[in-house]
């Protein structure tokens, strides 16, 4: 399994949203993994440009974090954990 991490400073966050699902976009994997279970690593999107995805495919919601340089989509297998992460970033 691929192992990736990302460090985001609160001061770099321009926007954070809680999404019901991953946007319907053409995400092209640059480096990382894409299986039926997860999307993880570096991707390029026609709408968002350079992206990092840390997404479990059948788990919702999804957090979208926009910084000046990139967009990060992430979630956890447990929706309560994802909501908790969103609240800690959003507040």
What are these regions (language model features)?
Residues 22, 56-91:
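Terminal and domain-flanking low-complexity segments
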Residues 2-7, 15-66:
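Non-transmembrane, membrane-adjacent beta-strand/coil modules in membrane-associated proteins
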């Amino acid at each position: 399994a691929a192992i990736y991490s990302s460090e985001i400073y609160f001061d770099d966050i321009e926007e954070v949203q809680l999404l019901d699902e991953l946007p319907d976009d053409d995400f092209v994997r640059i480096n990382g993994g894409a299986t039926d279970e997860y999307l993880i690593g570096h991707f390029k999107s026609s709408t968002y440009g350079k992206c990092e995805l840390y997404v479990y495919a059948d788990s919702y919601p999804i957090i979208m974090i926009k910084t000046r340089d990139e967009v990060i989509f992430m979630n956890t297998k447990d929706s309560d954990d994802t909501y908790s992460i969103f609240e800690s970033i959003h507040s």
